[in-house]
């Protein structure tokens, strides 16, 4: 392993990768006019939280116990995001007659419903979450986000195993 490839460098590179993923998400939304569904928005939140944990770890450069704490927080955010992506992939695999009904837009939900109901609707997904709007190499957007979340989870495992003792 090169000497320059410290945990701090890895954390910062992961933060930059997540910033790039968020930039690509906004590109798909605002340039390609792909409207994100509630589960997509929840996955974005998970990416932002994971990115903030990576940034905090890069700035703090934790040692033994600190690395364990950051790894735990990182695992919570990345595994939570992976669960959301898996849920959306499951919705996309349903036959058309089993897809849940489409719900209102997120802005309307935030204005009209209590936050607990909005959160439930975001995490369970609606009919628009089952729509495949874009693919690359045979994987839809939630497929690629699942790959990214698994990769970031592995980075936290690597950092935890490699932590200074």
Curated annotation (Swiss-Prot):
Transmembrane parts of this sequence: 11-27, 46-62, 69-86, 144-162
GO MF terms, alphabetically ordered: electron transfer activity; protein-disulfide reductase activity
Compartments reported by the entry: Cell inner membrane
Keywords: Cell inner membrane, Cell membrane, Chaperone, Disulfide bond, Electron transport, Membrane, Oxidoreductase, Redox-active center, Transmembrane, Transmembrane helix, Transport
S-S pairs: 37-40, 102-129
Subcellular location, principal: membrane
Topology relative to the membrane: Multi-pass membrane protein
Entry keyword Membrane: yes
Domain of life: Bacteria
Periplasmic side: 28-45, 87-143
GO biological-process terms attached to the record: protein folding
GO cellular component, as recorded: plasma membrane
Residue ranges, Cytoplasmic side: 1-10, 63-68, 163-165
Cross-referenced HAMAP family: DsbB
Similarity-based family: Belongs to the DsbB family.
Cited function: Required for disulfide bond formation in some periplasmic proteins. Acts by oxidizing the DsbA protein.
Name of the protein this chain belongs to: Disulfide bond formation protein B
Organism of origin: Hahella chejuensis (strain KCTC 2396)
Gene label: dsbB
